Amino acid sequence: MAHGRRVEKVSALIRKEMSQLLLDGIRDERVASSMVTITEVEVSGDLQHCKIFVSIFGQDPKREEAFSGLQAASGFLRGELGRRLQMRRAPEIVFKLDKGMEKGSSVLDLLGKLEEERKNKDEISEGMNF
């Protein structure tokens, strides 16, 4: 059980430090000019591999640019994490694009449209009742 807690703790620490690095550690303009949010961090049981799920706000070309900037900076970020967390060996970092927020936004848009259509339908049916 202690092993699972350690993985969770390291995951939380990586998320915290990586968020800080995204704010002030990356000088790559592709990443610095984008709004990048870490949505989840998954660390393997042996602490050697780390998947970082990110959400990037913006249009598709800009999003892809920022994501490729993150991937290019993964070696630098791995080294910084190792120094900041004082780990003997920093985990290998893999970035994954999380489209959950995007999907949630589109669902909310659809629900809004349905509500509007329902109101219009109710207004029309009320107008027909004399």
Curated annotation (Swiss-Prot):
The keyword Manganese does not apply. Pfam families: RBFA (PF02033). GO terms for biological process: maturation of SSU-rRNA. GO terms for cellular component: cytosol. One of several proteins that assist in the late maturation steps of the functional core of the 30S ribosomal subunit. Associates with free 30S ribosomal subunits (but not with 30S subunits that are part of 70S ribosomes or polysomes). Required for efficient processing of 16S rRNA. May interact with the 5'-terminal helix region of 16S rRNA. PANTHER family: RIBOSOME-BINDING FACTOR A, CHLOROPLASTIC-RELATED. HAMAP family: RbfA. This is Ribosome-binding factor A. It comes from Prochlorococcus marinus (strain MIT 9211).
